[in-house]
């Protein structure tokens, strides 16, 4: 009986630690992530981004010569991938990101950490998912070009909502900024 009680305590303690070690995936971004985003937006000119669009999606490489900034970029990408994998919302006020979350299960994403940044390959499982992925690539490129200005505004989804409701999705002009409401 004592062995079972001890084993139960060990399991409870270990599961408690494993649960608390996971970042919160629901609700607002943790302060650490908000600080990373603010830092990357402020130092956007220190980030270099190259994107290759293809008929199945895209490949993007984002790098920096600053090791601390590269570490923040990697931490942010790792967190966002986990958040999207958990089906948690991202930027619920931004139509393009709402669309990304809706289509995320139709995207295959491969993340490769580099010494100076990250390389991300995204493949859409269908034509609409490809459009959504490429729109996201353009938006993130805008973040690296414009910094906070681009981060703070809404972005158009790749697929128009009215076309989606009618069952035939019509491509919208991707990644053009909208004024924040």
Q: What is each of the regions a protein language model found here?
A:
Residues 8-18:
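Bacterial N-terminal signal peptides
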Residues 159-181:
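Compositionally biased, proline/threonine/alanine/serine-rich low-complexity intrinsically disordered stretches
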Residues 95-125:
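Short, solvent-exposed interaction modules
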Residues 57-58, 66-71, 79-81, 126-129:
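Primarily extracytoplasmic ectodomains and periplasmic/lumenal surface modules that are beta-strand-rich
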């Amino acid at each position: 009986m004592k062995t079972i009680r001890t084993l139960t305590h060990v399991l409870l303690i270990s599961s408690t630690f494993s649960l608390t070690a996971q970042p919160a995936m629901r609700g607002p971004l943790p302060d650490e992530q908000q600080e990373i985003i603010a830092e990357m937006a402020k130092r956007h000119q220190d980030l270099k981004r190259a994107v290759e669009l293809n008929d199945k999606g895209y490949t993007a490489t984002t790098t920096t010569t600053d090791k601390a900034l590269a570490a923040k970029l990697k931490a942010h990408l790792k967190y966002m991938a986990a958040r999207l994998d958990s089906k948690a919302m991202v930027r619920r006020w931004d139509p393009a990101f709402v669309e990304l979350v809706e289509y995320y299960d139709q995207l295959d994403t491969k993340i490769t950490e580099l010494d100076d940044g990250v390389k991300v390959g995204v493949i859409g499982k269908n034509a609409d998912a490809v459009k959504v992925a490429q729109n996201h690539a353009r938006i993130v490129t805008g973040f690296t070009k414009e910094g906070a200005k681009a981060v703070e505004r809404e972005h158009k989804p790749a697929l128009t909502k009215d076309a989606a409701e009618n069952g035939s999705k019509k491509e919208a002009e991707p990644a053009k900024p909208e004024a924040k409401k």
